[in-house]
């Protein structure tokens, strides 16, 4: 297991609200919670930036973190990420914030400490480009946008 530095920015983290952790041995993500002082109403079509109460420093350029939506919030309530996926670079040290977008037709009430997104760590390959005049032939070639099937 890889250790990542975590700074607690909200004193409720680790006391009233649990630290992010993997819920099961097979969990890919760790829940991030809304570190707000009172319930927040997110109106239909509205986007709110929600603090999580933590900052992380990954430091390893071979890793990055993503902030992803929780499936139940999106499916049942229309609450998804305003930026679809949040990317946390290894050298970022600022607070983790979650952009919540209510794509439903009804207002959503977000409570303090409520789980609102998940943090997933991923390996990163930092690539460089080699300029070429032609590519080596591949099975797919230039086919894209539905080229390989019905959709």
Curated annotation (Swiss-Prot):
Alphabetical keyword list: Hydrolase, Magnesium, Metal-binding, Nucleotide metabolism
Described by its record, this protein's role is as follows:
This enzyme is involved in nucleotide metabolism: it produces dUMP, the immediate precursor of thymidine nucleotides and it decreases the intracellular concentration of dUTP so that uracil cannot be incorporated into DNA.
State the EC number(s): 3.6.1.23
SUPFAM superfamilies the record matches: dUTPase-like
The source organism is Psychromonas ingrahamii (strain DSM 17664 / CCUG 51855 / 37)
Q: Which family does it belong to?
A: Belongs to the dUTPase family.
Name of the protein: Deoxyuridine 5'-triphosphate nucleotidohydrolase
Which NCBIfam families does the record associate with it?
dut (TIGR00576), PRK00601.1 (NF001862)
Q: Give the binding site residues for substrate.
A: 70-72, 83, 87-89, 97
Reaction catalysis annotation? dUTP + H2O = dUMP + diphosphate + H(+)
Query: Which example biological process does GO assign this protein?
Result: dUTP catabolic process
GO terms for MF: dUTP diphosphatase activity; magnesium ion binding
Q: In which pathway does it act?
A: Pyrimidine metabolism; dUMP biosynthesis; dUMP from dCTP (dUTP route): step 2/2
> Which cofactor(s) are needed, names only?
Mg(2+)
UniProt cross-references to InterPro entries, sorted A to Z: dUTPase (IPR008181), dUTPase-like (IPR029054), dUTPase-like_sf (IPR036157), dUTPase_trimeric (IPR033704)
For this protein, the record's Gene3D superfamilies field holds:
2.70.40.10
């Amino acid at each position: 297991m890889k250790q990542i530095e975590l700074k607690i920015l909200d004193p409720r983290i680790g006391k009233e609200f649990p630290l992010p952790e993997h819920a099961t041995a097979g969990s890919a993500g760790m829940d991030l919670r809304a570190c707000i002082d009172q319930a927040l109403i997110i109106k239909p079509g509205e986007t709110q930036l929600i603090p999580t109460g933590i900052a992380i420093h990954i430091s390893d350029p071979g890793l990055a973190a993503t902030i992803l939506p929780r499936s139940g919030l999106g499916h049942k309530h229309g609450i998804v990420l305003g930026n679809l996926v949040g990317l946390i670079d290894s050298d970022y040290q600022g607070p983790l914030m979650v952009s919540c977008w209510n794509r439903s037709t009804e207002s959503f009430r977000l409570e303090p400490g409520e789980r609102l997104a998940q943090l997933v760590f991923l390996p990163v390959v930092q690539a460089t480009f080699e300029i070429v005049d032609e590519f080596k032939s591949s099975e797919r070639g230039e086919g894209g946008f539905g080229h390989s099937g019905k959709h």
